[in-house]
C-alpha cells in the first residue's frame, strides 16, 4: 500500500504539470501556493476538483504527513512551508528531478546567465535536422513533465535549466552539460555570486562531458576534470586541438574547431560576437551528442534567432532599431552592447531600465563609454542606473517605453542603432519581457 503524500508547492504552468504527473502515477497529493490568488487556480480546480489546495499557509497536520515536496522553481528554498517540510523529514526537489528519475534517453543540459534559450533552440534544431526525435524543454516552452507522456517517442532531451531548477535537481546525468557564462543575476534570490555560481555548477554533476567558456572562470568545472570526463571549451580566441573558437584569416572571421575552419561568421544569420559564442557552444554540444557536422552547419546557416534577443526590427532614416527585451540583466546588456557596437561604424542609443534585481549598474560603464551615444531610461530603477552612468554619457528619462522610442529617435544619427536592452526585469511596467519587446516593436513600426 502506498502511504506517500506529495505536496505540490507552487501553481502556475509547472505546478499544473507536476499535478498531472502525480495523477498519472496514482500518487496522493495536496497543493500549496504562497499567493492568495494563485495563477492557474481555476484551471487547476477544474482539472483536480478533489485535491485539497492551501493558499498562503499549510496546516501542521498536513505538513507532518508529507513525504515529498515537488516545488516550482519560482518558490525560494527558504519559504517557510518548505523549511517546515524539510524539518519534518520530507524530500524536496523539482520537476527536472522527476524527469531525471523517469527517462533513459540521453540529455544535453544547458545553463548560463545569458544565451541559454538561443543555444537550447539551436541544438534542438540541429538534432531535428539529423533525424533525432528530440524534446526541447526545461526553462523554455512546455514544462518537462507534460512531455513525459510521450517519453518513448524521444531519443534525445535538450534541456535549458535555470539556477533555480538546478537547486532542486540531484540525479540528472547529462551526456554533455554546459555553463555558457555567469554574470550577476538573481542576486535577490541567491544573495551572493558564490551561491549563484554554485547553483550553476550543479549541472556538471554526473555529466559524461562538460563544455565550458574558457574566458569565464565561473564556468570552469569546480571539480577538476577527471580522466573519464571529457572537457571541451569554447571562446573568442583561436582554439587548441579539440576545442572551439574563432580564427581570423585574410580579413575573415571563421567559426573553428581546433585549426579547422568551419564557417565564416558572415554565413550565419544571428549577429554579434555574443551570438558567435552561442553558435560555437551549440556546435560543440551537438557534436558531443553525436550529431554530424553537416547537419550542425546547415542549421547554423538558416537559424534566424529568437524573438526579443538582439532581433532586428527595421531601419528608419538611416538608423537601425534592435529589440533585445530579453536583456533582463547587466551581463546580457553588456553582451548586446559589445556584440553590436563592435560590428558597426556608428554609435548606440540605449533604451534601458526596469527592475534591477539588486545589480551593480557601474558594470555597464566601460561598454557604454566605448559604444553608446546616449541612454534613455524607463522604469523602477531608472534612478540607480542614472546615478551609475550619468557621468559617462548623456542620460534622458521617459515615462513610458513609447515615449522612450520617440526620444531615442531624436538622439540617434544616421549610421547609429537604437538598442532596447534594458539590463532589468520587466514586471514593473509589463506582463513579461515578451510584452515589453512587443510594445517596443509596435512603437518602432509606427515611426
UniProtKB/Swiss-Prot annotation:
Recorded GO MF terms: ATP binding; UDP-N-acetylmuramoylalanine-D-glutamate ligase activity
Reaction catalysis annotation: UDP-N-acetyl-alpha-D-muramoyl-L-alanine + D-glutamate + ATP = UDP-N-acetyl-alpha-D-muramoyl-L-alanyl-D-glutamate + ADP + phosphate + H(+)
Pathway: Cell wall biogenesis; peptidoglycan biosynthesis
Function: Cell wall formation. Catalyzes the addition of glutamate to the nucleotide precursor UDP-N-acetylmuramoyl-L-alanine (UMA).
HAMAP family: MurD (MF_00639)
Chief location bin: cytoplasm
Organism the protein comes from: Legionella pneumophila (strain Paris)
Binding annotation for ATP: 112-118
Protein name in the entry: UDP-N-acetylmuramoylalanine--D-glutamate ligase
UniProt keyword list: ATP-binding, Cell cycle, Cell division, Cell shape, Cell wall biogenesis/degradation, Cytoplasm, Ligase, Nucleotide-binding, Peptidoglycan synthesis
GO cellular component terms listed in the entry, alphabetical order: cytoplasm
GO biological process: cell division; cell wall organization; peptidoglycan biosynthetic process; regulation of cell shape
EC number: 6.3.2.9
Subcellular location: Cytoplasm
Matches recorded under InterPro entries: Mur-like_cat_sf, Mur_ligase_C, Mur_ligase_C_dom_sf, Mur_ligase_cen, MurD
Record flagged with keyword Cell division: yes
Gene: murD
Family statement: Belongs to the MurCDEF family.
Record bears the keyword rRNA-binding: no
NCBIfam families per UniProt: murD
Amino acid at each position: 500500500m502506498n502511504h506517500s503524500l506529495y505536496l505540490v508547492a507552487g501553481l502556475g504552468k509547472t505546478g499544473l504539470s507536476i499535478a498531472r504527473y502525480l495523477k498519472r502515477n496514482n500518487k496522493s497529493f495536496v497543493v500549496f501556493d504562497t499567493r492568495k490568488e494563485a495563477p492557474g487556480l481555476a484551471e487547476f480546480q477544474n482539472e483536480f476538483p478533489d485535491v485539497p489546495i492551501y493558499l498562503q499557509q499549510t496546516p501542521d497536520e498536513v505538513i507532518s504527513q508529507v513525504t515529498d515536496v515537488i516545488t516550482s522553481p519560482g518558490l525560494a528554498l527558504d519559504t517557510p512551508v518548505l523549511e517546515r517540510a524539510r524539518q519534518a523529514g520530507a524530500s524536496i526537489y523539482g520537476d527536472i528531478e522527476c524527469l531525471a528519475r523517469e527517462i533513459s534517453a540521453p540529455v544535453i543540459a544547458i545553463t548560463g546567465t545569458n544565451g541559454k534559450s538561443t543555444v537550447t533552440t539551436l541544438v534542438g534544431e540541429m538534432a531535428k535536422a539529423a533525424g533525432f526525435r528530440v524534446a526541447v524543454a526545461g526553462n523554455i516552452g512546455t514544462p518537462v513533465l507534460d512531455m513525459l507522456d510521450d517519453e518513448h517517442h524521444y531519443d534525445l532531451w535538450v534541456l535549458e535549466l535555470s539556477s533555480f531548477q538546478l537547486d532542486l535537481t540531484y540525479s540528472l546525468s547529462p551526456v554533455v552539460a554546459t555553463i555558457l557564462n555567469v554574470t550577476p543575476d538573481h542576486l535577490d534570490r541567491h544573495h551572493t555570486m558564490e551561491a549563484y555560481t554554485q547553483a550553476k555548477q550543479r549541472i556538471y554533476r554526473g555529466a559524461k562531458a562538460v563544455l565550458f567558456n574558457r574566458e569565464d572562470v565561473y564556468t570552469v568545472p569546480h571539480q577538476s576534470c577527471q580522466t573519464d570526463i571529457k572537457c571541451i571549451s569554447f571562446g573568442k580566441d583561436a582554439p587548441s586541438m579539440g576545442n572551439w573558437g574563432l580564427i581570423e584569416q585574410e580579413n575573415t572571421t571563421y567559426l573553428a574547431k581546433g585549426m579547422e575552419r568551419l564557417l565564416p561568421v558572415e554565413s550565419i544569420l544571428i549577429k554579434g560576437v555574443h551570438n558567435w559564442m552561442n553558435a560555437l557552444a551549440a556546435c560543440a554540444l551537438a557534436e558531443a551528442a553525436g550529431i554530424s557536422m553537416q547537419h550542425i552547419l546547415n542549421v547554423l546557416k538558416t537559424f534566424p534567432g529568437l524573438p526579443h534577443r538582439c532581433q532586428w526590427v527595421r531601419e528608419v532614416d538611416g538608423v537601425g532599431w534592435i529589440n533585445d527585451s530579453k536583456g533582463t540583466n547587466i551581463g546580457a546588456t553588456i553582451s548586446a552592447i559589445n556584440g553590436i557596437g563592435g560590428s558597426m561604424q556608428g554609435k548606440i542609443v540605449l533604451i534601458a531600465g526596469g527592475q534591477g534585481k539588486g545589480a551593480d549598474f557601474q558594470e555597464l560603464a566601460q561598454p557604454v563609454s566605448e559604444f553608446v551615444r546616449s541612454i534613455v531610461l524607463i522604469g523602477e530603477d531608472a534612478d540607480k542606473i542614472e546615478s551609475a552612468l550619468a557621468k559617462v554619457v548623456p542620460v534622458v528619462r521617459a515615462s513610458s517605453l513609447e515615449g522612450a522610442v520617440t526620444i531615442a529617435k531624436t538622439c540617434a544619427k544616421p549610421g547609429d542603432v537604437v538598442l532596447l536592452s534594458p539590463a532589468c526585469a520587466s514586471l514593473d511596467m509589463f506582463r513579461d519581457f515578451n510584452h515589453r519587446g512587443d510594445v517596443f516593436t509596435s512603437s518602432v513600426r509606427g515611426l
